[in-house]
Amino acid sequence: PPSRRNAIYAVYTFSRRADDAVDSVEELQATPEEAGAKLEQLRALLRGEAPSDPLAPAIEDTIERFGVPLEHFEELIRGMEMDLHNQRYQTFEELYRYCYRAAAAVGLLCIEIFGYQGDPSEHAEALGVAMQLTNILRDISEDLTRGRIYLPLEDLDRFGYSPEELERNELN
């Protein structure tokens, strides 16, 4: 239905803006401070403090029509902030928190729009985290060029493998 489609467009656009803010730093088109300001603009949009933003009416309608919790939007923003400030994760728990925020939060937003019976939030979270972990594994080389290592450092250490070996693409 058009209302659900428009709500998904709004969530996608919000998510894209958050991700683009971080990507702009990685592409040297913005400073971390400028990217942080863009994320704060998204927070202002959620608070209803950005009425001139063309996305504002769509986000407001999505939240009101489908009862989408603001917390899921906020978690997504926090995930993007983690990307701005963290280049590496020490533990899987830290990485899981990032995956939850960067990906599972989007799934949790979407299930509110799709509608459901029962409580699929556990499955939406697991799917979002699994998709983000898959993305991390797929992009290991690309992330290394950006100085990022998403693989938990404690796991590298546990298997006798160093970040330096990973950066040199050494296999052992």
Each model region followed by its residue ranges:
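Acidic catalytic motifs of isoprenoid enzymes
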Residues: 1-172
